[in-house]
Amino acid sequence: MIREDEVRKLVGEMREPFLQRPLGELDAVKEIKIKPEKRHISVKVALAKTGTAEQMQIQQEIVNVLKGAGAETVGLRFEELPEETVAKFRAPSAEKKTLLNMDNPPVFLAVASGKGGVGKSTVSVNLAISLARLGKKVGLIDADIYGFSVPDMMGITVRPTIEGEKLLPVERFGVKVMSMGFFVEENAPVVWRGPMLGKMLNNFFHEVEWGEVDYIVLDLPPGTGDVALDVHTMLPSCKEIIVSTPHPTAAFVAARAGSMAIKTDHEVVGVIENMAYYESAKTGEREYVFGKGGGDKLAEELNVPLLGRIPLKQPDWDKDQFAPSVYDENHPIGEIYQDIAKKIDAKMSVQV
């Protein structure tokens, strides 16, 4: 079993994500406990900031290093470095440019729904990609912290990297992507309370190097909970798109998300009716599996346009570039998304 001095050396050689100095140089490896009979290692580490995406990333890196050295299980605790240590090692710099203080800020488009299971994340992914296909610079934030799915939908298998004090988003299909899914091990659940959710979302805005972007699409959690409230507070100029199925109940519940946007002075750009119908490949006959008219009724209630109806149909999967929820631009549904993206971009261009 690995010894304590070996653990200290391995962890101490890793770089603190904010100060970019070895943890050992910062005296940041605080406690080490080893249980040889259980092959368990417990480490307490100090960082310049805790509760951040960077903490999640270095946590995963430490776990991987120690498991590679022979541990079966790893326990990690974090605390913040003393202010004097942070001040000593942090280089002076000008105000950091973030998504919220750019000279030319992007258009924020939040994709919301009243309930889960209506295909909101699929819409978010394909809308972001369709905007990128129009030549726009697009970022996509998977803000569904508990139910993150964007990396899997887009077939992303790599994780963000760190450059300086910022995370670099993963880019695929011309879209820069950031998700909680990058910072948890495999399909592990996120067991957090509301304040931690808002903190992580804030990190996606402030601690990620997005570069120049025209649009940031946010895939919100369903409903009107903590994350949706945080978005309304952090992004007062955010636009919203409401996703519903044609089913009357889904449309009724989706109206709550729309009403919340209106009450907080967020413009609702329009409604997208997902799973609108199933069209037979043989006969062309349409079956309205989830009913009919829910999207129209919702759009009328919110006094916004129905941006499009998206039928039930699988994407054409490419084994070389596997992305289970992405529609090719020449796919019939890909063409519908492209049309929706054009409508949204035209409206945003007029407003600018």
UniProtKB/Swiss-Prot annotation:
It holds the Pfam family ParA. Induction: Autoregulated. The keyword Metal-binding applies. Keywords: ATP-binding, Hydrolase, Iron, Iron-sulfur, Metal-binding, Nucleotide-binding. GO terms for molecular function: 4 iron, 4 sulfur cluster binding; ATP binding; ATP hydrolysis activity; ATP-dependent FeS chaperone activity; metal ion binding. GO terms for biological process: iron-sulfur cluster assembly; negative regulation of DNA-templated transcription. Homodimer. Interacts with BrxC. It comes from Bacillus subtilis (strain 168). Belongs to the Mrp/NBP35 ATP-binding proteins family. ATP binds at residues 114-121. The keyword Transferase does not apply. Binds and transfers iron-sulfur (Fe-S) clusters to target apoproteins. Can hydrolyze ATP. This is Iron-sulfur cluster carrier protein.
